[in-house]
Design a protein with these regions (language model features):
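N-terminal beta1-alpha1 cap of cysteine-dependent amidohydrolase-like domains
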Residues: 1-109, 113-124, 129, 135-143, ...
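Amide-donor transfer/coupling interface in amidating biosynthetic enzymes
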Residues: 4, 52, 58, 96-98, ...
């Protein structure tokens, strides 16, 4: 079933069309639907292989939003997101820092979250290394299911006016862990633990509330500015009511829960 076009009324506060750079690498497999979600929210998507950005770093400056979508970049060899994260550290650090310092937005979904974490771009590294990482689920296997999520009074731009979401997950290395309790406490105090797994408000949990064992039930984290956000669930897989697994039996609203994330990103530049 084709998705309905976004009513013009939802775009009345957008004075210009922000451009989103959707990056991919070998193994990325969610770039098209993620770009589509941004375009449904009013953005213009540009799809680029990571090598294109390496060759043309000025490409980043031509966009207002940068997105690292889901998939298995470089086959998740070594560890999920590790190779692309290393490329970012060694060859794109200046480009990414300039993008951030210009007040722009960065979104990492699933593998993209793993990339942002392991590159140190989301949570900067210090003299002890990474503050946090994403590692193997407690079950030791790949998980694909729907989860309930709640926001955490965060400063995150992408979660403005969002309280609860129902989104799918699909990952093997989605367990968020911090280096120590001090890092976790600091992230809490700074309102950076933006999104958490929670129980279903209807009591219809289809599995453990926290599917992967993440510390403090963390499903998504933002940086100190609230403009860089990474999450393990896939918002692009629930932007239309027909994406909901119970859309024929329940009133799921005019839009899928994930759509608000993309709408907030676009509206930020309105």
């Amino acid at each position: 079933m084709a998705l309905a076009a976004i009513p013009q009324e939802t775009r009345t506060n957008i004075m210009s069309t922000p451009k989103v750079l959707v990056l991919r690498a070998p193994g990325t497999n969610c770039d098209q639907e993620t770009g589509f979600a941004f375009e449904q929210a009013g953005a213009k998507a540009t799809y680029a292989h990571i090598n294109q950005l390496l060759d043309e770093p000025q490409l980043a400056a031509e966009h207002q939003i940068m997105c690292f979508p889901g998939g298995f970049s470089y086959g998740d060899d070594i560890a999920a997101g590790r190779i692309l994260a290393s490329q970012m550290q060694s060859r794109l650090a200046d480009t990414l820092n300039e993008f951030r310092d210009a007040g722009k937005l960065v979104l990492g979904i699933c593998n993209g979250f793993q990339i942002l974490i392991k590159s140190g771009f989301l949570l900067p590294m210090d003299d002890q290394g990474m503050q946090a990482t994403l590692t193997w689920n407690n079950c030791g296997c790949y998980l694909a299911r729907w989860v309930d999520l709640k926001t955490n009074n965060s400063k995150c731009v992408f979660l403005k006016d969002v309280d609860h979401m129902y989104l799918p997950i699909a990952h093997a290395e989605g367990k968020f862990v911090t280096r120590n309790d001090a890092v976790l406490s600091s992230l809490k105090e700074n309102d950076q633990l933006a999104l958490k797994y929670c129980s279903s408000p209807t009591g219809n949990d289809c599995g453990p509330t926290n599917p992967n064992g993440s510390v403090a039930d963390v499903a998504g984290v933002c940086d100190e500015t609230g403009r860089i956000f990474g999450l393990m669930p896939h918002p692009e897989r629930n932007i239309d009511p027909t994406h909901h697994p119970r859309w024929t039996r329940e009133d799921v609203g005019p839009r899928g829960d994930g759509f608000k994330i993309f709408e907030n990103a676009v509206s930020f530049f309105g």
